Structure formats: structure tokens, C-alpha cells
Amino acid sequence: MQDQYSRTQLLLGKEAMEKLHNSRVAVFGIGGVGGYTVEALARSGVGALDLIDDDKVCLTNLNRQIVATRKTVGQYKVDVAEQRIHEIDPNIKVTTYKIFFTPETQDQFDFT
């Protein structure tokens, strides 16, 4: 386990950290709740993340979304989140989907 997760490992134990590292989590929507969720998952040691959102950062997101800064306005939220994740841990596998998950689009996703 990487040193950056050593404090978490003290709390959870080695076996739990290995489970986190081997886990894959999909997050639907990288806005007010999803953005913070992605950040927490990355900082917790989850090994793979699927990010699903077709929205771009806009000015009205600045007061409430972690992916929103003046620099990121106009960028896809999944791209901003992926960059942030890799700044936290470059070894996390990130798959981005620039599409909204709906009954009509569900066949375009592979979560196996």
C-alpha cells in the first residue's frame, strides 16, 4: 500500500485498504454532491472510478461545486474531476463518460 494512505490504513486495516484499492465505483453526476463524492473516494484509496456526466462547468457552479473554478469554466466536469483525481493519485484508473445515464443510454455503459 502506498504511503499516502498509511493514515487511513491505521484506521481501517490492511485488508480493508486492499479492498478499497481493488474496488471500482461509478459516480453519476459530478456536480454539487458527485464532485465531493469523487474527491472523497480518490482520497480514500479506491482504485478505479467511472465518472458519468455530460455537463460542463459554468459560472453558477463556482459557489457550490468542487470542480468549479474560474479556470475550469467551460470544461467538462468529468475531465476536470479526472485531472483532480490524478493530482491526488496518478495510479487511480479513471474512465469518463461524457453522456447522461438514462434508460435510452444505459446500453452504452459497461460496468463489468
Explain the meaning of each model-derived region.
Residues 46, 51-89:
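Glycine-rich phosphate-binding loop and adjoining beta1-alpha1-beta2 segment
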Residues 33-34:
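Hydrophobic/small residue at the entry helix of a nucleotide-binding pocket
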Residues 74-112:
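A structured beta-alpha segment of the ubiquitous adenosine-cofactor-binding alpha/beta core
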Residues 1-26:
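N-terminal charged helix/coil linker that caps or initiates catalytic domains
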Residues 41:
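Aromatic pocket-lining residues of Rossmann-like dinucleotide-binding sites
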Residues 27-29, 52:
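Conserved N-terminal Rossmann-fold NAD(P)-binding element of oxidoreductases
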